[in-house]
């Protein structure tokens, strides 16, 4: 939508290291081609400098675009350009700056998860032209694409003929409104994703022990420390501490137990040849149901 509105038949500068592919084989180059924008790759896979943007700007440049690497990371001899510098360069050259944030968040996340995930509020301090991010993921609301930015640019997007087909319905908007109100009230327990992220290890251990006590007579259960991947196209390769319960039963192989659990809507994983229930995603009111 953004690219089609502002960059049709014009160049958009993107770092080679940010030409991402997300789930379902959706790729930045293909999305750009569909919009009518002309992709101009700059820098290299592992290193892109501000000078790469500055040297590539010409009379047909419409936009400087940054894409957050939300589902992979490049380590070692690598660097990219801070969005703050991209904003300044875009303004100096009278072009649009745009940040596809992927999974932006609104508050400081636990376990230093905010370190490599862009903060919506922090990025807004740079007074960018346009930002986009997901309504679900770390924001913790409905699945939707959210665009914020300068009023005159948003007004132009609203006039794009594609908007009629892509706009969300009133139910989606009402759920999103309720979610954002929870942020304003600082009531994180109303946002399941954040509630799970912020649950203390002590609480998780207590829940795990509670389940173990309920099922000890019918199977072999053990409480242990484990690590949780956030997943969902966010915080690549980052794990946070958690507690889990491993379960074994008679001569049942782990794969069979896992299959039986999934048939009853209980998602688990196999770790060290044992079925593991991760209590980072299990609530207090679900323990009795799992035991049964």
Predicted features by range, described:
Residues 160-161, 272, 290-292:
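Composition- and surface-driven signal marking solvent-exposed, interaction-prone regions
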Residues 1-181, 216:
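Conserved PLP-enzyme active-site core in the AAT-like
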Residues 205-283:
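Conserved C-terminal alpha-helix-loop-beta "cap" of PLP-dependent enzymes
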Residues 280-292:
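Short, low-order "capping/linker" segments at domain edges
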């Amino acid at each position: 939508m953004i690219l089609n509105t502002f960059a049709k038949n014009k160049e958009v500068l993107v770092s080679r290291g940010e030409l991402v592919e997300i789930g379902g084989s959706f790729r930045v180059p293909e999305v750009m081609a569909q919009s009518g924008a002309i992709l101009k790759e700059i820098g290299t896979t592992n290193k892109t400098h501000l000078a790469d943007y500055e040297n590539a700007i010409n009379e047909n440049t419409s936009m400087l675009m940054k894409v957050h690497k939300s589902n992979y990371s490049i380590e070692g001899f690598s660097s990219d350009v801070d969005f703050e510098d991209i904003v300044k360069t875009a303004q100096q050259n009278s072009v649009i700056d745009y940040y596809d944030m992927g999974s932006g968040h609104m508050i400081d996340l636990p376990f230093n998860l905010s370190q490599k995930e862009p903060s919506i509020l922090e990025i807004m301090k740079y007074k960018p032209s346009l930002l986009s991010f997901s309504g679900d993921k770390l924001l913790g609301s409905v699945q939707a694409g959210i665009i914020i930015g300068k009023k005159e640019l948003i007004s132009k997007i609203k006039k794009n003929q594609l908007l009629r087909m892509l706009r969300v319905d009133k139910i989606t908007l009402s759920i999103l409104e309720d979610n954002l109100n929870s942020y304003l009230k600082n009531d994180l327990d109303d946002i399941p994703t954040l509630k799970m992220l912020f649950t203390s290890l002590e609480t998780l251990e207590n829940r795990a022990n509670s389940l173990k006590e309920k099922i000890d007579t019918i199977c072999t259960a053990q409480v242990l420390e484990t690590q949780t991947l956030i997943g969902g196209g966010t915080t690549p390769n980052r794990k946070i501490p958690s507690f889990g319960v491993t379960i074994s039963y008679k001569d049942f192989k782990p794969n069979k137990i896992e299959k039986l659990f999934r048939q009853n809507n209980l998602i688990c994983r196999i770790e060290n040849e044992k079925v593991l229930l991760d209590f980072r995603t299990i609530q207090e009111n679900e323990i009795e149901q799992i035991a049964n």
